[in-house]
């Protein structure tokens, strides 16, 4: 399995094998996990972007796709192939952000596939449209880490700049969720954690207090308190503060 990986990743695996030679079970687990993402979830698209499905679902989550490939940043500095693969993911993420910043998961093609027929403004690109702050934070963090690890800047293109403006506009809008937000989400015949109350608007929140609203947690479960910082993951909280 590891023989199919780029040389830079094979070197990293060899280093792990040497360092943890006394624990072959752990080494085997690492090799399987480290190679599985590239083998089964990553696809280079004809337009030069990279699509990363979750593995168990044929769709790409903005947040999850970052977490899946972030370990490969270690090799990106010395491996152009890996660097290009990751840059392709960044460009695809910001294409999706600009298409719909309220969506959390996207199809590989514009085919209309979806998790469920939810009551929200869907398009054929969208697999699911649960609005989560994390979905917008992670692509920004990933673009930064790619630059930090490789020094490349070509992914900071017009699409990226447009995406940053899109993200900021959404966060500003969602500071006044009740008055300004166009977003709503309802799923019929499901658990309460998979839908928003008040005809898809979520629990009533107070506007203008400096907090930005989120409909769902990183777990894809609905927020009970849309302005609560407690549900936001630590990396996301730090990204928002910075």
Task: Outline where the language-model segments fall.
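Low-complexity, Ser/Thr/Pro/Gly-enriched N-terminal "stalk/linker" regions
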Residues: 1-63
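Residues at structural and domain junctions
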Residues: 2, 16, 42, 54, ...
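An acidic intrinsically disordered interaction segment
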Residues: 18-42, 99-111, 188-207
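Acidic/His metal-coordination segments adjacent to aromatic residues that form catalytic metal sites
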Residues: 45-53, 112-130, 192-227
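Surface-exposed loop/turn and secondary-structure junction residues enriched for glycine/proline
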Residues: 55, 60, 64-65, 69, ...
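Residue-level detector of conserved catalytic or cofactor/ligand-binding positions
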Residues: 230-242
